[in-house]
Amino acid sequence: MALKTLQALIFLGLFAASCLAQAPAPAPITFLPPVESPSPVVTPTAEPPAPVASPPIPANEPTPVPTTPPTVSPPTTSPTTSPVASPPKPYALAPGPSGPTPAPAPAPRADGPVADSALTNKAFLVSTVIAGALYAVLA
């Protein structure tokens, strides 16, 4: 009986793995920048007076080179007409003389499959458990 139980657990594991493989990918996680907290209030402490410093000695700095303003070049002339590509042709069928015009296909739903469809992951998992239990009992 232990062999049948082990087989049933392997069976359930394979079906659970396939169920998880069919699950939609998770939405990407966006990290928000950390909120900067205000710095704590620093209580002033009594500090000894700073010693009197002598004035700094001026260094001989080179004089900056005068810059000339940029010159404005006259605008270049471009051709008066530029080649324009024609819009692409649709891939739909052209209406025939005796046939009806094809109707546009409905747009796919943006939110994915219907939530209460018959083959959701929960239903698949429950049916897998039932099949595994039947396999363990009857096999």
UniProtKB/Swiss-Prot annotation:
The UniProt regions of compositional bias labelled Pro residues, in chain numbering, are: 46-77, 97-107
Instruction: Kindly give the InterPro entries that the UniProt entry links to this protein.
Output: AGP
Q: Which residues carry this modification: Pyrrolidone carboxylic acid?
A: Q22
Q: What is any one of the record's Gene Ontology cellular component terms?
A: plasma membrane
PTM comment for this protein? O-glycosylated on the hydroxyproline residues.
Lipid-conjugated positions (GPI-anchor amidated aspartate): D116
User: Where are the residues of the annotated region Disordered?
Assistant: 30-115
Bilayer topology reads: Lipid-anchor; GPI-anchor
- Propeptide intervals in chain numbering: 117-139
Location comes to: Cell membrane
Function, please? Answer: Proteoglycan that seems to be implicated in diverse developmental roles such as differentiation, cell-cell recognition, embryogenesis and programmed cell death.
Protein name (Swiss-Prot/TrEMBL): Classical arabinogalactan protein 3
Tell me the gene name: AGP3
